[in-house]
Every structure is written in structure tokens, then in C-alpha cells.
């Protein structure tokens, strides 16, 4: 572990349907960062399974001074869960992490350097590598127990990378990009707690809690940057393409774009264009939608 003059909190929500093996790998990847976190806030979004609670007990036993558990009595969704987590963090810098992804070992160190170099920075993320289950998970997932040596669950060694999602790095480019798409990779975000709270924290915006928050922060004049480096291995599969389609998904997208337009973030032509693109993508068959998504990722990988 390397020492650093800036402290940060990790914020990770978890709910009962999470795979305990994935959860443990995700948590270890953050606790074993090259610059270790001062605090690890786990928000339990409603009652969990015994297997997930066993992982939490193991984390508390190993890192009793850092791990802080916030338990919500019922499942409220990721927006309210993250809002509760932000309020519970004791440090101003917060590293967001999903409960089924794997952070690169120097992710947080790179972001701390980024924040130290730009005192005006309030929001930052980086590239993500989307991956499928590696051989370790295929071999161990079914028989894994909480007593599996943690060295075996830290880093994906031969995972199948299906694509890399890169984003514009500079503030001006992010402002332009945000008018069409989410400008940050949520699972790789580091943010300033005071800035997030000043614009009202996370809200219950189904499927876009992060994007809606970023837009409010950008509208308030907060600075954002992205690193070109891959910071997180993000897990794909598990019905991702199905969740990104259908009439309900199209309606949610239109509702979000309408909100952006009414708030003054989008012009009317941008609003119409965004809605048309999202509706068209939502009604495509799953296979075609998945093909186009992977094609776009491959183009990014070789750009």
C-alpha cells in the first residue's frame, strides 16, 4: 500500500439478488487498492441473503475500522440507496463502485492524483473494460465459500474483454457529450461529497440516477474530467440487452430527456433527436441491439 495525503470513502450499494462471490471480489478490489480507502460505506438496500451477510461480516472482521454498514429497512432502489450512502460518508472524496465489478489496483490512486492536480474538480471517471466470467469464476463460482482465500478473488486474470467504453476526457468535450449520452462511467466515478449534496444528491430516477445527477452538477458549473485509463472491469451479460429495450425503457428515456429539456440543458432540436434515437434503439430486437452495441464497443477498442 502507498501512502497519500488525501483520504477518500468507497461507496457501494448491495441488494439481495447480488451474487456473493461477485460481491466479495468487488469489495476486495477496493479494499486492496494501491492507496487504501479511509472508509468503506456499504449500503444494504433492504434485507440481504445469509450468503451476502456472511460476506459483510468477513469484511467487518478484516477491516473493522474502515467498513461502515448502512442498512435500509426495505429495498428502495439504487438512487435512494446511494443518497443515503453519500450522506453517511465521512470524507469529501467518494469513490463509487458497483457490487459486481472489479476495480483495477491503482484506480483510486490515479483519481486522487487527478483531484490533487485540479482543486476545482468535482466529478471524475475513466474508461471501463466490459468483461464476461473468467475461468476462476467458472471453476469457483458454484462451490465458493466465504473462507476461500482472498488472493483467489481479487483480479480477473483471463476474463473475456468484450469491449472498452472510453469517454471524452476534457471538461468542454464532456459538456458537449452529455447532451447526447451519459458522460461518466458510474462504476468508475470519484466525486466530491459537498458538490453532490449542493445540487440535491442522488434522486430516484429509474435507470438514470447517475446521468441525471451529473447533468445537475454540470448545470451548476461543477468541473468534470475523465481519464483515458481503464479503471474498472465492468461485468456484462445477465440480461443487460433485455433491460435496455422495450416500451417501458423507451418511456423512461423520453421522460429523462423531457426533464433535461425543461431544465434548459437541451435545445428543442437536441431533445427531439435524442428521443428519436432512444425510441428506435428500444424497439430493435434484442439480438440486433446487442450486435450494434458490441460493434460500437469494438470500434472504440480499435479507435
Report the location of each language-model feature.
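Short, well-formed alpha-helical segments that are part of the catalytic scaffolds
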Residues: 17-32
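Conserved donor NDP-sugar-binding/catalytic core segment of glycosyltransferases
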Residues: 106-162
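Acidic donor-binding segment of Leloir-type glycosyltransferases
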Residues: 28-71
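Short aromatic/hydrophobic "clamp" motif used to bind/position activated sugar donors
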Residues: 94
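Glycine-rich, basic loop-to-helix element that forms the pyrophosphate-binding segment
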Residues: 72-89, 110
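The conserved acidic donor/metal-binding loop of glycosyltransferases
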Residues: 98-102, 127
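Conserved nucleotide-sugar donor-binding catalytic segment
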Residues: 10-13, 149-163, 168-248
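Cell-envelope/extracellular polymer assembly enzymes that use nucleotide-activated donors
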Residues: 7-11, 29, 39, 212
Amino acid at each position: 500500500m502507498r501512502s497519500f495525503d488525501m483520504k477518500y470513502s468507497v461507496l457501494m450499494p448491495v441488494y439481495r439478488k447480488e451474487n456473493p462471490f461477485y460481491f466479495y471480489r468487488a469489495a476486495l478490489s477496493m479494499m486492496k487498492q494501491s492507496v487504501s480507502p479511509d472508509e468503506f460505506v456499504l449500503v444494504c438496500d433492504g434485507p440481504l441473503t445469509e450468503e451476502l451477510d456472511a460476506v459483510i461480516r468477513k469484511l467487518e472482521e478484516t477491516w473493522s475500522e474502515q467498513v461502515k454498514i448502512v442498512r435500509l429497512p426495505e429495498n428502495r432502489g439504487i438512487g435512494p440507496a446511494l443518497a443515503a450512502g453519500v450522506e453517511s460518508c465521512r470524507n469529501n472524496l467518494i469513490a463509487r463502485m458497483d457490487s459486481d465489478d472489479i476495480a483495477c489496483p491503482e484506480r483510486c490512486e490515479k483519481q486522487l492524483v487527478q483531484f490533487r492536480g485540479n482543486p476545482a474538480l468535482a466529478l471524475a471517471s475513466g474508461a471501463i473494460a466490459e468483461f464476461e466470467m473468467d475461468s476462476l469464476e467458472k471453476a469457483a463460482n458454484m462451490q465458493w465459500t466465504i473462507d476461500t482465500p482472498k488472493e483467489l478473488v481479487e483480479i480477473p486474470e483471463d476474463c473475456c474483454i468484450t469491449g472498452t467504453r472510453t469517454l471524452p476526457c476534457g471538461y468542454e468535450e464532456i459538456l458537449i457529450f452529455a447532451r447526447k449520452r451519459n458522460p461518466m462511467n458510474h462504476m468508475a466515478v470519484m466525486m466530491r461529497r459537498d458538490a453532490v449534496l449542493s445540487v440535491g444528491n442522488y434522486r430516484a430516477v429509474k435507470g438514470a440516477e447517475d446521468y441525471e445527477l451529473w447533468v445537475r452538477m454540470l448545470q451548476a458549473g461543477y468541473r468534470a474530467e475523465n481519464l483515458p485509463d481503464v479503471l474498472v472491469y465492468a461485468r456484462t451479460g445477465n440480461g443487460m440487452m433485455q433491460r435496455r429495450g422495450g416500451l417501458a425503457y423507451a418511456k423512461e428515456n423520453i421522460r429523462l430527456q423531457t426533464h433535461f429539456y425543461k431544465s434548459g440543458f437541451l435545445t428543442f432540436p437536441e431533445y427531439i433527436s435524442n428521443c428519436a434515437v432512444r425510441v428506435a434503439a428500444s424497439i430493435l430486437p434484442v439480438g440486433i441491439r446487442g450486435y450494434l452495441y458490441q460493434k460500437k464497443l469494438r470500434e472504440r477498442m480499435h479507435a
